[in-house]
Every structure is written in C-alpha cells, then in structure tokens.
Design a protein with these regions (language model features):
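Hydrophobic cores of alpha-helical transmembrane segments in multi-pass inner/ER membrane proteins
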Residues: 2-13, 74-87, 146-151, 191-207
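Membrane-helix interface linkers and caps
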Residues: 2-33, 52-64
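Aromatic-anchored segments of alpha-helical transmembrane domains
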Residues: 40-49, 107-119, 166-178, 235
Length: 235
C-alpha cells in the first residue's frame, strides 16, 4: 500500500523515482543497480569470511513452505515500500542541491529510527551503560552507515539501486538457513566498513573520461565529504 501511494504521488509530480542514472560512466557494474548488487554481495562475503573464523548458527526464521512464502511477501513488500519512499524523499529534497547533504542526513535518520523497535529506544536512555553501548555499536551505527549508503544509491539511481543493496542483505538475512554467529563488535565493524568501502568505490567509479585520457569526477554536489567523515568516525 505504501509503495503504491508513493509511486502514484511521484507519477503525479512527474518524478521518476524507480530507476535512473545520474552518472554518465560507471566502472563498477554497468549501472547503479549492478553496483549496488556487487557491494551487497561484498558485504555478505565479509560476513561469511568472518563466520568461518567465529562460527555459524541456524537461522531463527521459519523454512517451512508457508513460512518462506509469508516471509517473501513480508520482506518484498516492506523493502519496496521503504525504498520507494526513500527515493521519493531524496528526489523531492534534492531539487535544491544546496540542501542535498541535509536532506540525505534527515532521510537517513528517519529510516534508522523507523528500523528500530519501540522497546529498543530504552537503550538510548543509557540506564545501563554496557547494553546501551552494545546496542549503539551493534545496531545503531551499522544502520546509520547502511542507510546513508542506501540514500546515496537512491540519489544516484533511484529506488531500484537502493533495493539492489538492501534487498541483497535482506535476502541473505531472511532466507539463508545458516548465518554467521558473530560477536557484536565484529558485526558492527562489517556493517559499517562494507558500506563505507562501497561508497568510496562508487565515488571513484563515477568519473568522466575525456579524449585526452584525463579523468574528471562527475560534477554534482553530493554528501561525499560529510558521508566519509561520518563513516570514518563510525568505524
């Protein structure tokens, strides 16, 4: 329902929020969607490699036919609704490029807060220091990094690109029968480092090549410096 409403609103306003390409040349994949899939796969690879050293555990989700079907419907509908909404907010807010960094920051925080259950907000009160620190390191910081990256992908390529990244991670989380059983510190590091590296890789890939073999970065005011600073501090 959310996806339908957002898509209709975008159509009425003449905004393409599903699939576009702001960069003229890509060196990682052929378009933002393929780049997002590759970065998502890279993050999963890091988790699997870490799992080899720290162990694996069984998935907590149901793998009965009914359970799988229910989860597919739930994950797919939620993912499409969230990413279409993300792309719509980014597209609407990025009409004025002077406010682009602020818009991406606001949208990121909004979706991070949306991802946290009401009971988890009690950790942010710091009544018990260690669980609060663990929650921030294990959940908040990776969510911040991944949502920042998803917003950046939505800015470059629309909802389809963001779905390519977030959908890859969701598919692994929900439909893999075994999952890496990682210490919260390792999980936090991977969840923050992978999107940060993905951001750097994409920043270096969207360049224009001139006839004189001189490369010029794609000229657009994006939150590169702010994003990199936040990601570095998070790591």
């Amino acid at each position: 329902l959310l996806a339908t409403i957002v898509y209709i609103l975008a159509k009425q306003e003449g905004k393409n929020i599903w699939n576009f390409n702001k960069a003229r040349h890509w060196e990682i994949g052929r378009n933002p969607f393929e780049a997002a899939l590759l970065i998502g796969g890279f993050q999963i690879s890091l988790m699997i490699i870490a799992g080899i050293f720290f162990g694996f555990g069984e998935s907590p989700y149901s793998f009965t036919p009914i359970g799988i079907t229910t989860n597919i419907v739930f994950v797919t509908s939620t993912l499409i609704g969230i990413e279409l909404s993300r792309a719509y907010f980014i597209k609407k807010g990025s009409l004025n490029r002077k406010n682009l960094t602020l818009i991406i920051g606001i949208v990121t925080i909004f979706f991070v807060m949306l991802s946290i259950t009401p009971s988890d907000y009690t950790y942010l009160l710091f009544k018990d220091l260690l669980p609060s620190i663990k929650f921030i390191g294990e959940t908040m910081i990776p969510l911040l990094a991944m949502n920042l990256f998803a917003c950046y992908l939505a800015y470059l390529g629309g909802a389809k690109a963001a779905i390519g990244y977030m959908g890859t991670l969701q598919a692994f989380q929900w439909f893999s029968p075994i999952l890496p059983d990682l210490d919260w510190g390792i999980a936090a590091l991977i969840g923050t480092l992978a999107p940060a590296l993905g951001f750097i890789i994409i920043q270096n890939s969207i360049q224009l090549t001139t006839p004189g073999n001189r490369k010029k970065r794609y000229k657009t005011k994006d939150p590169a410096l702010s994003w990199t600073a936040i990601a570095t501090i998070s790591v």
